[in-house]
Amino acid sequence: MEHSVSIRGLKIRYLEKGKGAPVVLLHGFSFCAETWVEIGLFDELAKEYHVYSFDMPYGIKSRSDKFDAKSRDEYAEFLNDLLKTLNINEPILLGASISGEVTLRYLLSGYSAKAGIVIGPVNVKSLAPNLNRITVPLLVVWGERDDISSPDNSKILESHVRNTEVHILKEAGHACYMDKPKEFKIIVKDFLKKA
């Protein structure tokens, strides 16, 4: 279940489980690969999908080698290299916070993906002029009380990305998946059935 791979000379740790279409889980800045295990999403999805959860090189709790990218686009390129190395084709990407932004940048770069799921992504306004280039289905989940990235940003995504589904979790903060794990899992599983 736990593996590591070398990408650009960096050791990247990841969890892997299940069979089926690939789903890639990417944590926020203050978290790690186990975040998705802790809320039960990793094991729940592994019943129907081939699930990967990466310790990204920017996570505070990540046990992967770290690097500071010159831009967030470089993290999207790094993610593409990681997926190519592991032969993960047409994944559904799920990214929270910084990883939500990285997911959006990955999709904007035209890299291979079946769909995207972003949770409270940061820096949405700076991406707005190009968001209409995203052509895959996009699920947007926000905590109503997110004080890091305003839930109003969901309107930007909804108005710029053609095939977007938005859910705002009541009484939840930036890490809404931690505050409301049961509701979050239902939303994600329903979206995956349609993607």
For each feature predicted by the language model, list its residue ranges.
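Acidic catalytic loop of the alpha/beta-hydrolase fold
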Residues: 145-149
